[in-house]
């Protein structure tokens, strides 16, 4: 499943350990470097500690800091950071941004990540 990723780094954030493991496995198989966080607070620490994160892939609905707030804070610090949201809930839970609905297949995740990374805006 490896793609031409130029070793981009993806931060995956999800409070469901099974989803976190699944997404990180799929992305590692695609050739990405992957960091994981089980919640929004841990994600913000990783974002501060690793300045080479190319994309934030975050669940929207999590206890504590939700994915929308994590993305807002992260993009304030790193305006070029790409963001892809995911949720099993209705798409209207995010104000704006790209969304991958759960459950997703490996090829859907890989395709959405590649598309977001390729988008220069």
Give the residues covered by each predicted segment:
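C-terminal output helix
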Residues: 104-121
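Conserved phosphotransfer cores of two-component systems
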Residues: 48-51, 73-81, 89-93, 97-98, ...
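Active-site residues of response regulator receiver
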Residues: 59
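Charged docking surfaces used in two-component/phosphorelay signaling
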Residues: 21-29
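Acidic catalytic/metal-coordinating carboxylates
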Residues: 38-42, 66-70
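Short hydrophobic/Thr-rich beta-strand motif most characteristic of the beta2 strand and flanking loop
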Residues: 31-38, 46
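Receiver (REC) domain active-site loop signature in two-component systems and cognate sites
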Residues: 62
């Amino acid at each position: 499943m490896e793609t031409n990723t130029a070793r981009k780094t993806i931060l995956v954030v999800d409070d469901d350990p099974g989803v976190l493991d699944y997404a990180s496995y799929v992305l590692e198989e695609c050739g990405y470097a992957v960091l994981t966080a089980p919640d929004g607070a841990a994600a913000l620490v990783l974002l501060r500690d690793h300045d080479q994160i190319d994309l934030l892939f975050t669940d929207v609905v999590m206890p504590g800091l939700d994915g929308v707030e994590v993305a807002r804070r992260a993009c304030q610090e790193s305006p070029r950071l790409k963001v892809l949201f995911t949720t099993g809930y209705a798409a209207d839970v995010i104000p704006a941004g790209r969304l991958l609905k759960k459950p997703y297949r490996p090829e859907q995740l890989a395709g959405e990540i590649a598309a977001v990374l390729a988008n220069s805006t």
